[in-house]
Amino acid sequence: DDSKIILRNVPDTPGIAAKILSPISEAGIDVDVIVQNVGSDKSTDFTFTVKNDLSEKAAKILKDLTEGFGGGEVELVKDVSKVSVVGVGMKSHAGVAAQMFGALANKKINIDMISTSEIKISVVVAKDKAEEAVIALHDEFELDK
């Protein structure tokens, strides 16, 4: 069980990701999916997932941290899940992401976060939609054959 932590409107400066994640790491909290969105106003939103049981601790660390660099709102969203499609050669198969996102959209499952690598596409969804998402992707990619 995971939580999503969003740190909004922090300065978009070199090293901001390290400033955010260093105290989280020092507290022994593992971070999973990370997304950073830079706005046109020189600020950034920084979002990541952690295990539910450590989410309150992580949010408190960030609230204390934001006071040190002048702003930033911390939002904690509990009960999210990561669902992934994994396969060697994912990068060379065009359309896998669109197919994945389409299958979820057809089931009215909203995607909160997206992370990709050469062999995996992961999405973060509401925990109560995770099982339905897994079934939708299983059906879409015909994994029972």
What are these regions (language model features)?
Residues 1-145:
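A conserved regulatory-domain signal marking ACT and ACT-like small-molecule sensing domains
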